[in-house]
Amino acid sequence: MVNIPGPKATKLVDEFKKITYDSTFTYPLVIKTGRRCKIEDIDGIEFLDFTSNIGSCPLGYSHPDILEIIKEYCSSERGAHKIAGQDFYCEEHFNIASKLLSVSKKNCKVFFINSGAEAVENAIKIAYKKMGPLPGVSCISDFHGRTLGALSFTLSKEVQKTNFPELPVKRIKFCTVDSDPQINQLESVLKEYKVAFILTEIIQGEGGLNVASKLFIQNIRKLADEYNVPLIFDEVQSGMGRTGKWWVYEHYGVEPDIMT
């Protein structure tokens, strides 16, 4: 029987907690090396990493093709002028933006950002610019991030929201079956309130891997058009090919106005 964490990891985690704010760490794993889907901690214990929910996680560790590209880029003068993508133009950003557009909805533009929560924050700001400072709509059990604005529309764990003020939000049920009696709840909200946007995941990640019913998402798109409200799909955890298509909305026969 292997004791996890081992002695080195236990010691480091204890020392770590003395000097850092323990906010998102949930498991006492101290990674030393990794290759493909295997990682090894500082005690020499090997783990299989099944995480694939965000960012580049599905690519695993130390993918040889990626390492070669990074090595080539960092060892040449190509990387010398890339201070920050938001300050200067560069070919690499143009190329990746073009590739993203080739697999996304038509007539849209790309805005690069640092994290999922920051993407949601800016999606909200874009909607506010169009509609004004009105309430937004999000679904119960959705997760959109822990920054203050995104947190207002994160409804997966109440503990995350304790002691923080909220932006105005209207909550609706996330329906997973077409026969749900509350599948038209959004229509009642839009009849009563003028809103700035509708924000939802299609497959809820942190909320429990709940898959939205096809009718639910199609109704949201229909009502967003009918009431002229921007529809934001949060694809941070479901996008980039994780469902067999580039974006999960493709399975539903609809497109968002804004996507993160």
Model-derived segments and spans:
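Active-site-adjacent loop/helix segments that line or gate small-molecule/cofactor pockets in enzymes
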Residues: 1-35, 92-93, 194
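PLP-dependent aspartate aminotransferase-fold enzymes
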Residues: 95-197
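Catalytic PLP-binding core of fold-type I/II PLP enzymes
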Residues: 210-244
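Conserved active-site segment immediately N-terminal to the catalytic lysine
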Residues: 248-260
